[in-house]
């Protein structure tokens, strides 16, 4: 008598991916708190914050022999409880409709990200408010950017002024050469200034992370819409939302998520423009807006500049069928240049309008802050550090100190030029938005690897770009169909 075969349950790929990133996210969060914040100070400030909400005895029990704080522990417990529900839904996926399974999973992931990223960031914002301006925040992305907004409103050039008499100085002076430089571009403080004015007028204080959190939430939604299937939408939400490094950057307030938003917005608009063009509708306005968004990214941080060659190559390649008539290449190039300029000019104009006035105001100071400081040629340069080629320079003793100059530009050129050529060649053969992002990410990674510093926040940013690239390039699937995904995201 034959026995009925019962299939063995195997977790879906998205469940396994969520579990891996959830564990990584929690471990990194707790280690980051332990490394960056003195535990007694953390417990004291949390007790002050919750003095009227939780009994002191409960706080003491949660704080006993812990390297993190009671609120973070509760957020972690909620997140793992939600993951248990996720596993049950995944277990029952054959008994539930595809639409119901996707919607429940999507909502659970959103809630988990909300707990571990937005909830944790909200906690640090509140702790900073009851503690000190230099506490629970990144020095450059939060503290220094807030000071530049104050300089802006006072008519002071942030590229000329120093930051010795600001909360930045409380971080210490050894290797803190950013006290004499603002290494970011003007859009970082120009965009945030209205939020500063509204926040200080309404509640009396401001935290730059409010801007980052708002833009990160929009980034997650836009990134989901860049993909072509519900499975890809769920995957990009998991990896982007629980990015082991980028999520910590959002929590502490580094500004890579700010740059990421403008890039994702630009590509979302460009994708809409291409869809409109395929439907024989005029895509001009959407296309121009997409270039404006990328221009804003370029006016925020130099890491976005490496995207421009691939955007130019993509625009030229997609125009080529319109100008190719079997003639020689020189004629094709000359025929295509006016159209290329017409497509790219909003990006260039946006960058010039945002950065130009500051450059004209004091060009030497701006170049020194944005370029010479990171290149090691400023009077007070950035240190040699990170996870890239620079460690070999230190290991071989090629510099007397970590602040000394070494010609990393040679290594950068040796790595970046072939990567740029290969990326443009591949883009020419395989034109597509995912190919543009892929070439950008590989070129930026190669350049940063050979640079003076490959900081961990750059890797989180690169992981975000690679994540979007991967899921954008995934083939279309109708399990569940695109309408279900759109309904869940609505």
Stretches with model-predicted labels:
Residues 2-109, 113-279, 313-456, 469-470:
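Primarily membrane-embedded glycan-assembly and transfer machineries that use lipid-linked glycans
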Residues 111-112, 485-489:
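Nucleotide-activated chemistry modules centered on ATP-dependent adenylation/adenylyltransferase
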Residues 262, 269, 286-288, 293:
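Amphipathic coiled-coil alpha-helices
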Residues 284, 326-327, 483:
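Residue-identity detector for glycine
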Residues 288, 292-316, 353, 452-458:
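Transmembrane helices and adjacent periplasmic/lumenal helix-loop junctions
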Residues 367-370, 476-486:
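Short, Lys/Arg-enriched, Gly/Pro-containing loop segments at transmembrane-helix junctions
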Residues 459-477:
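Transmembrane alpha-helices of multi-pass inner-membrane enzymes
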């Amino acid at each position: 008598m034959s026995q009925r075969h019962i299939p063995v349950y195997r977790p879906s790929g998205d469940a396994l991916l969520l579990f891996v990133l959830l564990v990584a996210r929690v471990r990194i969060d707790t280690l980051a708190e332990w490394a960056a914040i003195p535990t007694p100070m953390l417990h004291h400030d949390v007790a002050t914050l919750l003095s009227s909400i939780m009994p002191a005895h409960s706080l003491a029990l949660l704080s006993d022999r812990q390297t993190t704080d009671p609120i973070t522990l509760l957020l972690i417990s909620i997140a793992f409880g939600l993951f248990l529900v996720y596993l049950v839904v995944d277990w029952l996926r054959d008994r539930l409709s595809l639409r119901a399974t996707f919607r429940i999973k999507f909502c659970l992931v959103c809630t988990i990200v909300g707990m571990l990223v937005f909830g944790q960031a909200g906690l640090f914002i509140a702790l900073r408010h009851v503690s000190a301006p230099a506490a629970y925040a990144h020095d450059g992305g939060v503290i220094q950017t807030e000071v530049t907004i104050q300089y802006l409103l006072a008519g002071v050039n942030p590229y000329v002024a120093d930051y010795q008499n600001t909360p930045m100085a409380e971080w210490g002076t050894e290797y803190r050469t950013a006290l004499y430089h603002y290494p970011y571009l003007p859009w970082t403080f120009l965009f945030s200034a209205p939020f500063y004015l509204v926040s200080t007028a309404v509640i009396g204080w401001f935290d730059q992370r409010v801007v980052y959190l708002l833009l990160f939430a929009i980034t997650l939604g836009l990134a989901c819409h860049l993909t072509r299937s519900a499975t890809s939408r769920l995957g990009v939400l998991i990896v982007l939302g629980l990015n082991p490094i980028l999520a910590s950057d959002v929590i502490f307030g580094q500004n890579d998520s700010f740059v990421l938003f403008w890039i994702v917005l630009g590509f979302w608009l460009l994708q809409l423009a291409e869809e409109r063009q395929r439907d024989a509708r005029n895509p001009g306005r959407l296309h121009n807006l997409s270039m404006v968004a990328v221009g804003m990214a370029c006016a925020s941080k130099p890491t976005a500049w490496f995207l421009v060659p691939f955007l130019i190559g993509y625009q030229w390649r997609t125009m080529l069928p319109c100008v190719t008539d079997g003639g020689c290449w020189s004629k094709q190039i000359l025929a295509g240049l006016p159209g290329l300029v017409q497509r790219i000019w909003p990006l260039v104009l946006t960058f010039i309008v945002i950065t130009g006035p500051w450059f004209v105001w004091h060009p030497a100071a701006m170049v020194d802050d944005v370029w010479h400081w990171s290149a090691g040629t400023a009077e007070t340069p950035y240190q040699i550090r990170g996870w890239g080629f620079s460690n070999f320079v230190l290991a071989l003793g090629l510099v007397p100190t970590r602040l000394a100059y070494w010609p990393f530009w040679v290594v950068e050129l040796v790595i970046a030029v072939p990567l740029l050529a290969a990326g443009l060649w591949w883009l020419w053969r395989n034109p597509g938005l995912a190919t543009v992002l892929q070439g950008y990410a590989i070129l930026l990674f190669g350049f940063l690897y050979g640079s003076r510093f490959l900081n961990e926040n750059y890797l989180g940013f690169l992981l975000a770009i690679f994540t979007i690239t991967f899921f954008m390039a995934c083939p279309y699937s109708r399990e569940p169909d695109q309408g279900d995904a759109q309904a869940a995201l609505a």
